[in-house]
Swiss-Prot record:
Listed name of the protein: UDP-N-acetylglucosamine 1-carboxyvinyltransferase
Keyword field: Cell cycle, Cell division, Cell shape, Cell wall biogenesis/degradation, Cytoplasm, Peptidoglycan synthesis, Pyruvate, Transferase
Pfam families: EPSP_synthase
EC number(s) on file: 2.5.1.7
Binding site for phosphoenolpyruvate: 22-23
Organism placement in taxonomy: Bacteria, Pseudomonadati, Campylobacterota, Epsilonproteobacteria, Campylobacterales
Broad EC category: transferase
CDD domains in UniProt: UdpNAET (cd01555)
Main location: cytoplasm
GO CC terms in record: cytoplasm
GO molecular function terms attached to this record: UDP-N-acetylglucosamine 1-carboxyvinyltransferase activity
Described purpose of this protein according to its UniProt entry: Cell wall formation. Adds enolpyruvyl to UDP-N-acetylglucosamine.
Subcellular location: Cytoplasm
Gene3D superfamilies reported in the protein's UniProt record: Enolpyruvate transferase domain (3.65.10.10)
Length: 422
């Protein structure tokens, strides 16, 4: 088992290039199922979840050539429509093959998903919407069995709550359906905008891209021919590196980043005293002598992202005063609190609110990652903790961060990946 050893107290400097967005790449990869021709994807991040989904495509019969940040995919040879437990249990996003498989082939079986253990993230909204489009769905032995013998048809889908994965699944299902699908209360993250633009560039008429209401005219079963897709920059990775600069009171520059996608994080960091130089595709954060406390509430895009909550908690732990952080999207996303407290943070929980009382210093300790973003918060805390911090169970990090320790080391951090002694 691998872990990260961090010796804290080093200032950071220099620049870091932001990788492609995992959460954009996953639905884009799933959407290639809508085509029976070659599709080229560029700027893919080197993370485990991407390799897992590409492996799933090959298990379905697709042909994948993947080298570095580029993948060439041809799903014209798919022979199976069953996404097996062995793959889906590793990564929740595997459920994204449900919509495209069903709309193209009229049937599929997908194992119920796995991934980060951050509360209940049921897929009932996905299934209810697909049923409205004509699917017959049963759940047996841990698998979703879906059939649409006459193909899917357009429908008016009103999501009871905003769901990113549900929106993505229905966009893909609607692309090859017969007739017009209207999605009300759709998610509008940049990753969803990229998926819509990819499908629209292939000839599908989509109105309302970037809004909460989408109208999609399907092709009635005709597969799509996609152009080359360049994955957008990872806004969560970008936010994480801004927090690395913030917590270490360092000046660093992020390259290949879209500032508009991380506006909520920038605004909160500005309220904490940090200043920024923002160019077309780069951002430089400038340090502050005193970190102000912050109050924030996680909410759907364009609000403050739940995927940045843990990282901001690490920064708030070093603030001059008390911060309040409310988690409204997931009920079990404070598992990093006890680990941050092991490093000397002073954090109290009451329901969905964390009260973070800033401390003068943190101290190195052994800590354990519990999910993807929580693990990055522990790394951030380790950057400023006195002594040595060992972050264990970093397979969570590898699911979503492209070479985190390498990029931090290039900025000046004392961080190395090590193997546990047997």
């Amino acid at each position: 088992m691998q872990y990260l050893e961090i010796k804290g107290g080093k200032k950071l400097s220099g620049s870091v290039t932001i990788s492609g967005a995992k959460n954009a790449a996953l639905p884009v990869i799933a959407a290639t199922i809508l085509s029976d021709k070659d599709v080229t994807l560029t700027n893919l991040p080197n993370v485990v979840d991407i390799r897992t989904l590409l492996k799933l495509l090959t298990m379905l019969g697709g042909v994948v050539e993947h080298e570095g940040t580029v993948a060439k995919i041809n799903n014209g040879s798919i022979t199976s429509t069953k996404a097996v437990y062995e793959i889906v249990s590793q990564m929740r996003a595997s459920i994204l093959v449900l919509g495209p498989l069903l709309t193209r082939f009229g049937e599929c079986e997908v194992s119920l998903p796995g991934g980060c253990a951050i509360g209940q993230r049921p897929i009932d909204l996905h299934l209810k919407a697909l049923e409205a489009m004509g699917a017959k769905i049963t759940i047996e032995s841990g698998y979703v069995h879906a059939v649409a013998p006459n193909g899917l048809h357009g429908a008016k889908i009103i999501f009871d709550k905003i769901t990113v994965g549900g929106t993505e699944n229905i966009i893909m299902a609607a692309a090859l359906a017969k007739g017009t699908t209207i999605i009300i209360n759709a998610a509008k993250e940049p990753e969803i905008v990229q998926l819509c633009e990819m499908i629209a560039d292939a000839g599908v008429k989509i109105e309302g891209i970037g809004t909460n209401e989408l109208t999609i005219e399907g092709t009635d079963g005709i597969p799509l021919a996609f152009k080359t897709v360049e994955i957008i920059p990872d806004r969560i990775e970008a936010g994480t590196y801004l927090c690395a600069g913030a917590i270490t009171k360092s000046e660093i520059t992020l390259n290949k980043v879209n500032a508009e996608h991380i506006r909520a994080s920038i605004d909160k960091l500005e309220s904490m005293g940090f200043t920024f130089d923002i160019a077309k595709d780069s951002i430089t954060i400038h340090p502050t002598d005193i970190i102000n406390p912050v109050n924030l509430i996680t909410i759907e895009y364009p609000g403050f992202p739940t995927d940045m909550q843990a990282q901001f908690m690490a920064v708030a732990a070093m603030a001059d005063g008390e911060s309040l952080i409310e988690e409204r999207l997931f009920e079990n996303r404070f598992m990093h609190v006890s680990e941050l407290n092991r490093l000397g943070a002073d954090i109290w929980l009451k329901g969905s609110v964390a009260a973070v009382k800033g401390v003068k210093e943190l101290h190195g300790a052994d800590v354990m990652a519990t999910d993807l973003r929580a693990s990055s918060a522990l790394v951030l805390a380790g950057l400023v903790a006195e002594g040595t911090t060992n972050v264990r169970r970093i397979y969570h990090l590898d699911r979503g961060y492209d070479n985190l320790e390498g990029k931090l080391a290039a900025l000046g951090a004392d961080i190395v990946r090590k193997e546990e002694e047997k």
